[in-house]
Amino acid sequence: MSTAVINTDDDQLEPTLQSILDQKSLRWIFVGGKGGVGKTTTSCSLAIQLAKVRRSVLLISTDPAHNLSDAFSQKFGKEARLINGFENLSAMEIDPNGSIQELMGQAEEGEGPAAGMGGMMQDLAFAIPGIDEAMSFAEVLKQVKSLSYETIIFDTAPTGHTLRFLQFPTVLEKALAKVSQLSTQFGPMLNGLLGANGSLPNGQNLGEMMEKLEGLRETISEVNGQFKDENLTTFVCVCIPEFLSLYETERMIQELSSYHIDTHCIVVNQLLFPKKGSDCDQCNARRKMQKKYLEQIEELYDEFNVVKMPLLVEEVRGKERLEKFSEMLITPYVPPAGGL
């Protein structure tokens, strides 16, 4: 395992993700950034490197686009599956908007005039923004906790959705309060509609519904506490050297800071390194622009490990190319002579 450093300044941190590999206590690692900056490639590559130094690693995609299957050329689903060619690296792709019916084990609605009451209660109880996503995320955490992986990496959705999970305990508490309020308000009416076993016409038991919600809320609250422990959790920001991406990265880092979530690594993808004497005007102009934003990144985040990754000629897909790309997260890329 290399710890090579190309920067010799004493005050400059190593431009690699080696610190993440060395921090054995880390259990949760999030990889996030603006859409199209290489989050999935980075998260897959980091997972490959971690698998070399950890007992077991799980890579989870919470991005609706689900690019893990494309990256590894292997189909993944909502159950953890071993990645071909690895003995201790698994992956899964989850739907962040799983249906309430599926999450609550909802039975099919019956027939008759009262058949719609269960559905109405459900619609009223779950008419809370984000409840589907919150419950889906809580179910995943519940499953992940029982699987006892040493390290879990999240390939997150684009920036706007990345930190939504931090609000999920509040969302689930609102849903619990709503169900409780409805059961009180409609108590007399429900008494005439409840089945012999105390269930609604569609088979859903209110007590079981509240118990399920409470269990999910406890799970997500417990794990959120771990997310705020820098010994257990870190967030890797991925960007490209352009204005909008830099702006999104700064906004994300500020938000992470407000939630007390550790972040000390930034991966800058798609860097151009024109050869000395290159007559490609577009390449040189773009490199000049990239250099400006790269200098801003290094100035703004002088206390971060800033990893510089080159724009490659070939698409990074498949185990072999991902492994090759992952090496540059640990051993800094050295541009050809004359490349700046």
Curated annotation (Swiss-Prot):
Concerning Gene3D superfamilies, the annotation shows: P-loop containing nucleotide triphosphate hydrolases (3.40.50.300)
Q: Where in or outside the cell?
A: Cytoplasm; Endoplasmic reticulum
Active site annotation, chain numbering: 63
- Set out the biological process GO terms recorded for this chain's protein: cellular response to oxidative stress; pheromone-dependent signal transduction involved in conjugation with cellular fusion; post-translational protein targeting to endoplasmic reticulum membrane; response to heat; response to metal ion; retrograde vesicle-mediated transport, Golgi to endoplasmic reticulum; tail-anchored membrane protein insertion into ER membrane
- Annotated InterPro entries: Anion-transp_ATPase-like_dom (IPR025723), ATPase_ArsA/GET3 (IPR016300), ATPase_ArsA/GET3_euk (IPR027542), P-loop_NTPase (IPR027417)
Pfam families recorded: ArsA_ATPase
UniProt-listed Enzyme Commission number(s): 3.6.-.-
The question of whether Mitochondrion is a record keyword is answered with no
Q: Gene Ontology terms, cellular component aspect?
A: GET complex
Transmembrane domains' residue ranges: none
Q: Which GO terms describe its molecular function?
A: ATP binding; ATP hydrolysis activity; guanyl-nucleotide exchange factor activity; identical protein binding; metal ion binding; protein folding chaperone; unfolded protein binding
For the ligand (Zn(2+)), the binding residues are 280, 283
Q: Enzyme class, one word? A: hydrolase
The subunit structure is:
Homodimer.
Per its database record, what is this protein's job? ATPase required for the post-translational delivery of tail-anchored (TA) proteins to the endoplasmic reticulum. Recognizes and selectively binds the transmembrane domain of TA proteins in the cytosol. This complex then targets to the endoplasmic reticulum by membrane-bound receptors, where the tail-anchored protein is released for insertion. This process is regulated by ATP binding and hydrolysis. ATP binding drives the homodimer towards the closed dimer state, facilitating recognition of newly synthesized TA membrane proteins. ATP hydrolysis is required for insertion.
Q: Which HAMAP family match?
A: Asna1_Get3
Which family, according to the similarity comment?
Answer: Belongs to the arsA ATPase family.
UniProt protein name: ATPase get3
Q: Tell me the classification of the organism that encodes this protein.
A: Eukaryota, Fungi, Dikarya, Ascomycota, Pezizomycotina
Q: Give the gene name.
A: get3
